[in-house]
């Protein structure tokens, strides 16, 4: 997704593995799959996703502005990366894969942690597209300062990137939530103003 609509999530090399999202019941049990390209609509079923927040060595968070061509929430600022795990793929592995695809950034799984394992949300964008996701949240910690982090954003996914202080991101979610994606707002409010601990 994405985020989250994920319409551009596959590539020619791996789209055969990336064409489906995992459908869930109200208790979070897997109940099947559905084509990723068609699952997001005004009647989106509950499905599995993830969100990732990448921090530099000083604790600044990488935020992205969704591409203007995205089906849902185009041009909206959000967390670093979101996506849909493949069948059999862990949340961490999915976050590594999508962050590389969307931003050209290689994350170290040893420096990542699922910090909000039970996060879920439902939201409707201005065009009527619904998101309904069980969406564990990952935080990844880099060993470099932001100025040494090399990024290569995919223009089909990402319009702009910025590094912001964690407190600033939290304050933005509290005071001007309309500037951010609804999932990023809810996640930041659950996190609170203090940096999550990642080894």
Swiss-Prot record:
Chain coiled-coil ranges: none
Gene3D superfamilies named in the record: Nucleoside Triphosphate Pyrophosphohydrolase
Keyword terms: Cytoplasm, Isomerase, Isoprene biosynthesis, Magnesium, Manganese, Metal-binding
Domain spans labelled Nudix hydrolase: 45-186
A GO MF label: isopentenyl-diphosphate delta-isomerase activity
Binding site for Mg(2+): 82, 102
Recorded metabolic or biological pathway in which this protein acts: Isoprenoid biosynthesis; dimethylallyl diphosphate biosynthesis; dimethylallyl diphosphate from isopentenyl diphosphate: step 1/1
Enzyme class at the top of the EC tree: isomerase
Binding locations of Mn(2+): 40, 47, 84, 131, 133
UniProt entry tagged with the keyword Flavoprotein: no
Active site: 82, 133
Keyword ATP-binding in record: no
Catalytic activity: isopentenyl diphosphate = dimethylallyl diphosphate
Domain of life according to the entry: Bacteria
Cellular compartment(s): Cytoplasm
GO biological process: dimethylallyl diphosphate biosynthetic process; isoprenoid biosynthetic process
SUPFAM superfamilies according to UniProt: Nudix (SSF55811)
Family, per entry: Belongs to the IPP isomerase type 1 family.
Protein name (Swiss-Prot/TrEMBL): Isopentenyl-diphosphate Delta-isomerase
Taxonomic classification: Bacteria, Bacillati, Actinomycetota, Actinomycetes, Propionibacteriales
Gene this protein is translated from: idi
